[in-house]
Amino acid sequence: MMSSSSSEIDVVKTRIPTYDEDDNTVLYAYETKPEFVNKEPNIVSDVSCNTEEQQKTVNDVLIHCQVIYDAMQNLDKKIDVIRRKVSKIQRFYVKSLWTNRKRYGYKKYSYRLAKKLKLKKMKKNEVYESFSYPESYSPTLPVSRCENNSPSNFPRPSFCMEEYRRAEPEEDPILSRTPSPVHPSDFSEHNYQPYYASDGATYGSSSGTCRGNPRADGIHNTYSTDHASAAPPSVARSPFENDRYIEEGSITKHPSTWSVEAVVLFLKQTDPLALCPLIDLFRSHEIDGKALLLLTSDVLLKHLGVKLGTAVKLCYYIDRLKQGKCFEN
C-alpha cells in the first residue's frame, strides 16, 4: 500500500497478478520514481547548510553585541570616576571662595589704599632725605648731657636724626667761658640753689630762668664753677635738672651756632608757657641751632607730634629768629 503522505506523481503503480482465479483481489506494487530519489538528498543538504550559516551569523552578532556591551560598561565606570573628580574639584573651589572671600569693591579700595601708602612712603623718604645729615649741625663739638629720668610724653617721629658721638672731655665754647663773679645778694634775690650733675660738675639754676623777655640781661644764673665746687653735695637739686649753664650774652650769637642747650634756653626765654613742654622733645632729638632753623609746621605736626597752636607759635618765633628780630626790644 502507498502511504497517505506519498503522492501518486512521485511513485510508479504496478499491478501484481494473482495465482488464485477465484479471488477477486487485485494487488498493486508502488515504486518511487528515480528522479525523486536522486533529488531528495540534495534538498536536505542545502537546508542543513543554510541553518549552519545562519547559526554562525547569529553567534557572530551576539559576540559583537557582548563586546559593545562590555565597552559601554567600561565607559560608564570611567564617566563615574570623572564625575566624582569634577564634583570634588567644584567643592574645593567653592570652599576656597568662601574662606578667601574678599569684601565688596576690594580691588577698587585696595588700589586706593596702595596708592595712599605709596604717597605716604614718598613723603617720609623726602622728609628723611631733608633731615639726614652726615655730620652734626653745629660746628662745635656736642656737649655731653645728663640723661633725663622723666619719660617724654611726646611721640617720636618716623625719621631718626643721626646721634651725636660723644666727644672727648672738651666743653662747648659757649659753656666754657668763665663768668664774672656774682654778688651774694643775687642768690637771695633769685633763690639760687646749686646742684650736682652726674659727671661731677656743679650747675646752677634760678627760679627766674623762664621769662617772657628774650634778652640775655634777664639771665641771672651766673654762678662761677669755682664757687659751686665748694657747695656740699647734700644741697637740693634744681627743678631744671638737665639745664646746662650758659653764659650771659651767648644766646645772642647766630642761631646756626647754637648747641642743644642754647636752643632749650631760647625756648625758655621766648615763651615759657607754650614752648617749655617741648624741651624734652628737643633734647631727645638733639635739635640744635641749624635743626631749629630747618623746622617747619609740617614737620612739627606730622613727625614730632606738636599741637597746632604750639607749632604756629614756634614757627612764628623761628621766622623772627631768621630775620634777626627775636632779640629786639
Swiss-Prot record:
The modification Phosphoserine is found at residues 138, 238. It holds the Pfam family SAM_1. Residues 258-325 form the SAM domain. It is found in: Nucleus. Gene3D superfamilies: Transcription Factor, Ets-1. Keywords: Nucleus, Phosphoprotein, Repressor, Transcription, Transcription regulation. It comes from the Eukaryota. PROSITE patterns: SAM_DOMAIN. One of its GO terms (cellular component) is nucleus. CDD domains: SAM_Scm. PANTHER family: BEN DOMAIN-CONTAINING PROTEIN 2, SAM DOMAIN-CONTAINING PROTEIN. Belongs to the SCM family. Putative Polycomb group (PcG) protein. PcG proteins act by forming multiprotein complexes, which are required to maintain the transcriptionally repressive state of homeotic genes throughout development. May be involved in spermatogenesis during sexual maturation. This is Sex comb on midleg-like protein 1. It comes from Hoolock hoolock (Western hoolock gibbon). The gene is SCML1.
